[in-house]
Amino acid sequence: MSNKPKRILVSNDDGYFSEGLQALVEAVSPLGEVWVVAPDREQSAASHAISLHRPLRIKEVRERWFAVDGTPADCAYLAINHLLKDDRPVLMVSGINHGANLAEDIMYSGTVAAAMEGALLGVPAIAFSLVARRNFDFAPGARFARSLVSSALSRPLPPRMLLNVNIPGGVEPEGYVVTRQGRHSYGFEVVENEDPRGRKYYWIGGSDYQHEDIPGSDCNAVFRDKRVSVTPLHFELTDHGRLPDLSGWQVDGFNRHEPDGA
């Protein structure tokens, strides 16, 4: 049996210099050979964008630590298909994000997108986020990350497995819960201002946070129970519950056919 250390790819969306990334690297370094490929600047809420219409550049910051002038998904793509193509990582981890990636956050999250790109490319992946807005203490999350990654490395994981992990901030978590994705809202705020030349500009976002009380959800685990949420995600976005609703539709001027295999 080979004693070669297991290769772990680390990325994020906050940038290669971020405190959360450093905490995650320090947490998992004893478990294998760590390679960091992360954005060269803040890329929060970049979602799963990839750069198809401009060239990308890679800068080696130090040994096995690279900065990419692209999105989080670009980083995962370049790492797996170029930098590490001859010896692919056995696991990818992303984070630790400076803020939550709960509920609908996953649709916008660059942290989750980096991990998702890894999973799409056949490398099982885990995204880690610290649910806090200030006074980031990454130590509890780093301890959980080390334990979870150690467990993941000790067993064969499905190639496209993707886990989204959220750690409550400001507390020592009371264990963890395997959860479903919840639902929440930030208030859909639009702030309008005017620049010195009289032109309007806008900030979007919102600070009126509310989440729904959904049993078994990631939001309930983190906010109500102060526990780490571990949510398995997948790429199948079909709303199967709506398929029967569409069965009676008829689009004028076009024949309706049954799907293959129905």
Curated annotation (Swiss-Prot):
One of its GO terms (molecular function) is exopolyphosphatase activity. The keyword Translocase does not apply. Binds 1 divalent metal cation per subunit. Its main location: cytoplasm. Signal peptide: none annotated. Its cofactor is a divalent metal cation. It comes from the Bacteria. The keyword Nucleotide-binding applies. This is 5'-nucleotidase SurE. It comes from Myxococcus xanthus (strain DK1622).
